[in-house]
């Protein structure tokens, strides 16, 4: 009942109510931001993550401050076309990022990366190197097991189609994947 009340309160939008947005960066350096995520430890560390398809991966530890700087993870991420970021609901220190933007074949990705220490170190998930274009990702708690779902696409790149199309699921931290829905039409 409480959940339904919360959902219902979100479903009504008064068009007369003005919403004011305040820019928080990363300024002139983050590229086009494609993904944003509140850190799973946000209540304790205030961290917000931002991922850009041409600017890398960033975090800010005080998003409420207009002067608090964004920290770039490393120059390595600049050209990876980061398109999605998600945290593990069962382990606040585990975060996944996906790469590759299918829209207009803007940038081929190199799969997914994972951190298990809150973002200090990252490892490429070699099981995902064929996933060239990632549309979205979510990590869900399924009866105590963290299930990672990713939507991947195939797109025309250098004259031929590249990538693996479908909806995929991993229950072992990205070591292996099960196809949930594959071979989606190129025009879907």
Q: Residues of each region from the PLM?
A:
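Extracellular glycan-interacting surfaces
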Residues: 1-188
């Amino acid at each position: 009942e409480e959940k339904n009340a919360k959902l219902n309160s979100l479903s009504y939008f008064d068009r007369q109510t003005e919403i004011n947005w305040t820019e928080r960066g990363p300024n002139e350096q983050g590229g086009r931001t494609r993904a944003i995520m509140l850190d799973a430890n946000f209540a304790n560390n205030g961290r917000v993550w931002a991922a850009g398809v041409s600017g890398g991966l960033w975090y800010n530890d005080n998003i409420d401050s207009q002067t608090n700087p964004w920290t770039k993870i490393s120059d390595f991420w600049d050209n990876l076309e980061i398109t999605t970021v998600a945290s593990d609901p069962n382990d606040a220190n585990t975060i996944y990022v996906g790469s590759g933007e299918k829209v207009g074949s803007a940038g081929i990705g190199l799969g997914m990366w994972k951190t298990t220490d809150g973002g200090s170190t990252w490892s490429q998930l070699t099981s995902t190197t064929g996933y060239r274009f990632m549309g979205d990702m979510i990590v869900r708690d399924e009866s105590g097991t963290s299930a990672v779902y990713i939507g991947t696409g195939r797109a025309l790149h250098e004259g031929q189609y590249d990538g693996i199309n479908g909806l995929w699921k991993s229950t072992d931290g990205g070591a292996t994947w099960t196809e949930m829905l594959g071979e989606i039409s190129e025009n879907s």
